[in-house]
Amino acid sequence: NYHPASEKVQALDEKILLLRPAFQYRDNIAKEYENKFKNQTTLKVEQILQNQGYKVINVDSSDKDDLSFAQKKEGYLAVAMNGEIVLRPDPKRTIQKKSEPGLLFSTGLDKMEGVLIPAGFVKVT
């Protein structure tokens, strides 16, 4: 029974261990975008769990087997996220500019400005 972000339920005593996402990327994307996507996904799942009344503890591991005995004992549930993601430029909101090779210090590479959109799947277990 999911409650939207604006609606909060009564706090529970249970703590959920939220493991770091382990995503596979099918594109050669910049690390900054990979990290931003992981962080935003983690924040969104954390919000959903908090709105359900759980206390969320972020864990720096992405494998449940790496949890210590104390962590397993403390947590009511461990939540892992994995999946396969493709980040692509949104064709409606992205502009590709040709670089000017005559400029001093120019790399000769095209420049893109716009929005990346994710596609793929995320499995939460």
Curated annotation (Swiss-Prot):
SUPFAM superfamilies the record matches: XCC0632-like
Pfam families in the record: NLBH
Chief place where the protein resides: membrane
Cellular component terms per the entry's GO annotation: cell outer membrane
Region (N-acetyl-neuraminyl-alpha(2,3)-lactose binding motif): 92-97
Subcellular location: Cell outer membrane
Segments forming a coiled coil: none
InterPro entries: NeuraminylLac-bd_hemagglutn, NeuraminylLac-bd_hemagglutn_sf
Membrane topology per record: Lipid-anchor
Entry keywords, A to Z: Cell outer membrane, Lipoprotein, Membrane
Keyword Membrane appears in the UniProt entry: yes
Protein name: Neuraminyllactose-binding hemagglutinin
Naturally occurring in which organism (per UniProt): Helicobacter pylori
